[in-house]
C-alpha cells in the first residue's frame, strides 16, 4: 500500500491529536539530500565508532576495524541493492520484458535490503581476514556489535520515508499514515519494533555476551540468532515483504526475509549449543586471551633479560672499584 510522504505521521493512541510531518528531503538542491541517506550515514558512523571502541575486547585494533569497513561499505551497498533487485526483478523490466539495467543501478530511487548487505559484509570479512591473517571469528564478533547498532539507528530512515510499516492494528501505539488527503490507515510501527529489538540486542552484546564469550564467533552467532528471531516476528507483520518468487507453503507466499531469518535462527542456535555445550572451548583459545598470554610471556622474558643484564653489570662495577683501590694504594 502506498502512503503520502507529504502528510503527517501521528500516534493517536499515545499522543492524541499531536502530529509530526517530516519532509523526507532534508536539503532541497540538485536531486535533494534525503533524511534516509543522512540517517543511514549516521548509522554507519555510529556502528563504526562502537566497533572500533570494542575492538580491543576481542583482541583486535581500531585500525583492523577501520581497514575492513573501508572495503566493506561499498560492497555492502552493492550487496543490499543486488539482493533487492533479484527478488523484485519484474520491477526492472521494460515494456517488452527486457531488463532495464539503468533502473537496476539507480539506487538513489530506493530499493535496498539489509540481508544483502550482511551477506556481502561476511564475504568481505572472510577475504580480508585471510589476507591479513586475522581470526575471522574475532573480527565478526566486533562487527556484529557495530552492525546491530547501525540497524537500530538506520530503521528511523524508514520512519522519515513513511515505509516498512506493518498491517492494520488498533493497538494503543498504532501509527497513523495518510493514503490520500481524506483517508488514512493505522498500522503497526514495525520500524520501531525492529529498532527497539536491535537496541536490546546491542546492549546484550556490549554488556553481557562479549564479556563472557566462550569462543571467537560467539557474538556473531548471537547476532544471527537475535536478529533472526526479531526479523521473523516483524516480517510477519509487514505488508511490503519481498517474496520468494512464486513459491508458496500451504497456499501462502514465502517471505524471503522470514525464510532466511528462520534458517539463521536454527543454524545459529545449533552452532551456539555445539560450541558452548557439546564441544566447549578452552578460554585460552580466545584471540584476546591468547594475545594477553603472549604479551605476558614476552614481558616476563624482558624482565628476565633485564635481571641478567643487571647481574652482569654489578660484578663488573665491583671489579672496577677494586682496581681503583689497588691503583691508589700502589701510588701511595
Where are the model-predicted features located?
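A feature for loop-to-transmembrane-helix boundaries and adjacent hydrophobic helices
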Residues: 1-332
Amino acid at each position: 500500500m502506498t502512503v503520502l510522504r507529504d502528510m503527517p505521521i501521528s500516534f493517536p493512541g499515545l499522543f492524541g491529536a499531536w502530529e509530526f510531518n517530516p519532509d523526507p528531503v532534508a536539503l532541497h538542491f540538485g536531486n535533494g539530500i534525503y533524511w534516509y541517506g543522512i540517517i543511514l550515514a549516521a548509522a554507519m558512523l555510529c556502528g563504526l565508532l562502537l566497533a572500533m571502541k570494542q575492538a580491543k575486547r576481542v583482541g583486535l585494533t581500531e585500525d583492523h576495524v577501520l581497514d575492513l569497513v573501508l572495503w566493506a561499505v561499498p560492497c555492502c551497498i552493492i550487496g543490499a541493492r543486488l539482493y533487492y533487485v533479484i527478488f523484485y526483478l519484474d520491477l526492472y523490466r521494460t515494456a517488452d520484458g527486457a531488463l532495464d539495467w539503468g533502473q537496476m543501478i539507480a539506487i538513489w530511487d530506493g530499493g535496498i535490503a539489509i540481508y544483502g548487505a550482511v551477506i556481502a559484509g561476511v564475504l568481505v570479512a572472510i577475504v580480508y581476514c585471510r589476507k591479513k591473517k586475522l581470526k575471522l571469528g574475532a573480527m565478526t564478533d566486533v562487527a556484529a556489535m557495530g552492525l546491530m547498532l547501525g540497524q537500530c539507528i538506520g530503521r528511523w530512515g524508514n520512519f522519515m520515508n513513511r515505509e516498512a510499516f506493518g498491517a492494520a492494528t488498533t493497538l494503543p501505539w498504532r501509527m497513523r499514515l495518510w493514503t490520500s488527503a481524506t483517508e488514512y490507515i493505522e498500522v503497526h510501527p514495525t520500524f520501531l519494533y525492529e529498532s527497539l529489538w536491535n537496541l536490546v540486542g546491542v546492549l546484550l552484546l556490549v554488556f553481557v555476551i562479549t564479556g563472557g564469550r566462550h569462543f571467537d564467533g560467539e557474538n556473531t552467532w548471537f547476532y544471527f540468532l537475535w536478529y533472526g528471531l526479531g526479523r521473523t516476528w516483524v516480517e510477519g507483520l509487514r505488508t511490503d515483504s519481498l517474496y520468494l518468487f512464486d513459491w508458496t507453503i500451504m497456499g501462502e507466499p514465502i517471505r524471503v526475509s522470514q525464510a532466511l531469518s528462520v534458517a539463521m535462527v536454527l543454524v545459529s542456535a545449533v552452532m551456539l549449543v555445539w560450541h558452548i555445550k557439546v564441544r566447549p572451548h578452552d578460554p585460552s583459545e580466545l584471540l584476546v586471551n591468547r594475545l594477553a598470554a603472549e604479551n605476558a610471556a614476552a614481558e616476563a622474558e624482558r624482565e628476565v633479560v633485564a635481571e641478567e643484564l643487571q647481574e652482569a653489570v654489578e660484578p663488573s662495577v665491583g671489579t672496577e672499584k677494586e682496581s681503583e683501590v689497588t691503583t691508589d694504594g700502589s701510588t701511595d
